Amino acid sequence: MAEIRRKLVIVGDGACGKTCLLIVFSKGTFPEVYVPTVFENYVADVEVDGKHVELALWDTAGQEDYDRLRPLSYPDSHVILICFAVDSPDSLDNVQEKWISEVLHFCQGLPIILVGCKKDLRHDPKTIEELNKTSQKPVTPEQGEEVRKKIGAYKYLECSARTNEGVREVFEAATRAALLTKTHKSKKKCSIL
């Protein structure tokens, strides 16, 4: 049993891949049907650097309807994942226009990991065709890294819940970042003001 417990909160636009990422990591199966999330919690045991960590995974709704409810998930967090979809440049724009300000308001000082979800769609012909209709292209790794620098995130990672590529790496990086927060002299926790 893990004696170290950490809390992770995942945020980002609706339908950008947050819930699938959590379900694939915690349960090992990809949900084929999209059901919008209100709030869901999962727990996963993660081992990093010889440490067993019980990671509480707090899923949140990205839709605007839940903007007033979402902050209730932030208190006592140790790490935040801000997600966007590689097949949705608008969701990356929203990282800078919406998500980073919300996270910094409620969770200043916590490590943030920027996650590009749906990496498998970057070279998908149907996705490219759809984006071309609006003169857009899938987000590149370089664009993701550029936004990471702008928002001051700890790390930028990409994954595909559908193919399971990069999923474990996201949560190992998040766990490492969450463990770093305990080494600070003052306890940095999220609070609602």
Swiss-Prot record:
The gene is rhoA. GTP binds at residues 12-19, 59-63, 117-120. Residues 191-193 form a propeptide. GO terms for cellular component: cytosol; plasma membrane. PANTHER family: RHO FAMILY GTPASE. It comes from Emericella nidulans (strain FGSC A4 / ATCC 38163 / CBS 112.46 / NRRL 194 / M139). Its main location: membrane. The modification Cysteine methyl ester is found at residue 190. This is GTP-binding protein rhoA. NCBIfam families: small_GTP (TIGR00231). Signal peptide: none annotated. Has a role in cell polarity, primary and secondary germ tube emergence and cell wall deposition. It is a lipid-anchor. InterPro entries: P-loop_NTPase, Small_GTP-bd, Small_GTPase, Small_GTPase_Rho. A motif (Effector region) lies at residues 34-42. GO terms for molecular function: GTP binding; GTPase activity; protein kinase binding. The keyword Iron does not apply. It is found in: Cell membrane. Belongs to the small GTPase superfamily. Rho family. Keywords: Cell membrane, GTP-binding, Lipoprotein, Membrane, Methylation, Nucleotide-binding, Prenylation. GO terms for biological process: actin filament organization; fungal-type cell wall organization; hyphal growth; regulation of actin cytoskeleton organization; signal transduction; small GTPase-mediated signal transduction. It comes from the Eukaryota. A lipid is attached at residue 190 (S-geranylgeranyl cysteine).
